[in-house]
């Protein structure tokens, strides 16, 4: 059973989330030859103040 974890900045709409999980599910089924009901996805919102790159918080850019 494929399990996909997606971490992204907060602020995406419910419609964007629906589209994302649909497309991730479709791609996973195509690539791995599994059925959609075996694909699990967890979406995690992260505030920019809790995410950094190259030693800088995204909230500081």
Which residues fall in each region the model found?
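A domain-level signal for the structural core that forms small-molecule/cofactor-binding pockets
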Residues: 2-61
């Amino acid at each position: 059973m494929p399990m996909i974890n997606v971490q992204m900045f907060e602020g995406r709409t419910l419609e964007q989330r629906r589209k994302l999980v649909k497309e991730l599910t479709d791609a996973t089924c195509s690539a791995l030859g599994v059925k959609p009901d075996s694909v699990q996805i967890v979406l995690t919102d992260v505030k920019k103040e809790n995410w950094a790159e190259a030693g800088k918080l995204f909230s500081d850019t």
